[in-house]
């Protein structure tokens, strides 16, 4: 009897039907949309999903997967798995992105985003702009303003040793359904067997599944830094090092979870969709904000596969932190050999004046000398010189021109060309594509110190748009620039960027020194969409 009761309890605990019902309700439109693009129709029903899961658990169906033939039922299961990974891929800490001024969004989005603005910024919804230009590079503001307060830096590159069993080990913390985990394992093994083949064998669903596996691997490493911050707070692991410090100097700040991509800002429907999932993840799954405590200065930044952890501490603490990270990688993430992990601890003060490459951007280290003279009553103290180190971010214009040359918008020397494949679109649609392309480049590089050099890139896009329209209407470029196109739209006015838009990537409670940057630039900030 005891065994029967335990079996019933385990069956009710592992096989939760409400999970499948929830996934079907939230993914019905997505699966239907993808099924139409792949020229097949999948009727979504709870019985069909359970039937597909039962077939996937049989041995003779696993051989079908090895041959590379996915039926309609497996395509539906693959879509459901991808959406199920959305709940798992919610970052432990992320950033909020305020919208543009000219666009209107629901009040719920405004209340969730405008929780704490930077002291250098003003509320954009009151018709005011920021006092200084910030963009995606505002995540690097700590390099310019606060990096001199940190004396040691720990850096590493994430080596994606993606194995199906490692991903399943991570998923088990969030999903308790044995059948669904078994589906994960079969699909992941099927994907890994086809990684060495040509990309033509993959479809959109498989690409999304591979990207989800990569994100799960990276977010698990981000969770390690969040847990280690809490251990520093409790002074359990690092008590011998932090013993001289007083606990009263720690001040608590809360990092709220809210993540909106750049594509979501441009599309209101996707924006509402992400807000809904954010509320659902907080209420139903109980994800609460994580409390962090600052100690001196601490900064964590991850961009794609490179992460940086800088703080104000001694060398013993940083080496201990690096040792714990390497042990976490070897025991938890499957890197059984230390030569896969190369965490480096070096002194920031040893950075030279030459240009270096950090996280894919050019960084230049400058030194400023401040002359200080103190006078007490009639006594004048000797003159002292304070040396302050700054790190500047440069925008390589030749790389931008090279990217435009790749998409046939200009020559290798920067001479504008017409876009032949866009001549089949309407006039407004052509201008809108060039406008979005220009705004995306400006937003990305507006945080650099030489952002004024982007005016040359603006001229390239402007004349490339004019040449595309001239090629379409069989006229000259001068006539296109001087006359108005459809709906009284002038190209000179469309590409006028006097209004300064900005994207803030600051956290709540800006006055604190703690910074945790979670940047996912992979497949989110593209120069243009595929034709």
UniProtKB/Swiss-Prot annotation:
Molecular function per GO: RNA binding
Keyword tRNA processing in record: yes
Highest taxon, organism lineage: Eukaryota
Keywords, in A-Z order: Chloroplast, mRNA processing, Plastid, RNA-binding, tRNA processing
InterPro entries registered for this protein in UniProt: Domain_X, Maturase_MatK, Maturase_MatK_N
Function: Usually encoded in the trnK tRNA gene intron. Probably assists in splicing its own and other chloroplast group II introns.
Similarity comment: Belongs to the intron maturase 2 family. MatK subfamily.
Name of the protein described by the UniProt record: Maturase K
This protein's encoding gene: matK
């Amino acid at each position: 009897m005891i065994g029967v009761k335990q079996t019933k309890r385990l069956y009710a605990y592992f096989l939760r039907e409400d999970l499948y019902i929830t996934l079907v309700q939230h993914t019905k439109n997505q699966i239907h949309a993808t099924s139409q693009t792949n020229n097949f129709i999948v009727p979504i029903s709870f019985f069909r999903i359970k039937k597909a899961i039962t077939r996937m658990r049989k041995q003779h169906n696993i051989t079908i997967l090895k041959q590379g033939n996915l039926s309609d039922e497996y395509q539906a299961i693959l879509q459901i798995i991808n959406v199920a990974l959305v709940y798992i891929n919610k970052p432990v800490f992320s950033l909020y992105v305020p919208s543009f001024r000219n666009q209107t969004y629901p009040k719920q989005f405004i209340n969730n985003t405008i929780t704490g603005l930077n002291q250098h910024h003003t509320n954009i919804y009151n018709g005011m702009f920021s006092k200084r230009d910030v963009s995606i590079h505002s995540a690097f503001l700590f390099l310019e303003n606060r990096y001199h307060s940190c004396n040691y830096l720990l850096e590493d590159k994430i080596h994606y040793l993606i194995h199906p069993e490692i991903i399943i080990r991570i998923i088990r913390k969030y999903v308790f359904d044995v059948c669904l985990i078994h589906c994960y394992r079969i699909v992941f093994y099927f994907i890994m067997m086809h990684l060495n083949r040509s990309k033509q064998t993959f479809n959109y669903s498989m690409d999304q599944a591979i990207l989800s596996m990569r994100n799960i691997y990276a977010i698990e490493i981000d969770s390690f830094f969040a847990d280690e911050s809490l251990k520093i707070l409790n002074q359990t692991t690092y008590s011998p090092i932090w013993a001289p410090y007083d606990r009263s100097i720690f001040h608590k700040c809360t990092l709220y979870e809210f993540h909106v991509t750049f594509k979501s800002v441009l599309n209101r429907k996707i924006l509402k969709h992400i807000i809904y999932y954010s509320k659902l993840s907080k209420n139903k799954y109980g994800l609460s904000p994580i409390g962090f405590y600052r100690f001196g200065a601490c900064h964590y930044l991850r961009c794609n596969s490179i992460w940086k952890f800088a703080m104000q501490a001694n060398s013993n603490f940083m080496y201990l932190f690096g040792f714990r990270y390497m042990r976490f990688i070897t025991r938890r993430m499957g890197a059984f050999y230390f030569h896969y992990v190369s965490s480096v601890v070096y002194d920031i003060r040893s950075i030279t004046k030459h240009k270096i490459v950090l996280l894919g951007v050019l960084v230049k280290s400058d030194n400023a000398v401040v002359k200080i003279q103190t006078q007490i009553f009639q006594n004048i103290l000797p003159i002292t010189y304070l040396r302050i180190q700054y790190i500047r971010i440069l925008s390589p214009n030749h790389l931008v021109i090279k990217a435009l040359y790749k998409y046939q918008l200009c020559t290798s020397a920067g001479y504008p060309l017409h876009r032949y494949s866009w001549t089949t679109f309407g006039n407004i649609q052509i201008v809108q594509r060039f406008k979005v392309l220009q705004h995306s480049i400006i937003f990305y590089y507006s945080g650099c110190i030489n952002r004024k050099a982007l005016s040359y890139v603006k001229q390239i896009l402007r004349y490339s748009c004019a040449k595309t329209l001239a090629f379409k209407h069989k006229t000259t470029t001068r006539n296109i620039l001087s006359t108005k196109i459809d709906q009284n739209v002038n190209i000179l006015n469309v590409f006028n960027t006097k209004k300064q838009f900005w994207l803030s990537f600051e956290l709540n409670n800006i006055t604190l020194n703690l910074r945790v940057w979670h940047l996912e630039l992979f497949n989110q900030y593209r120069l243009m969409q595929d034709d």
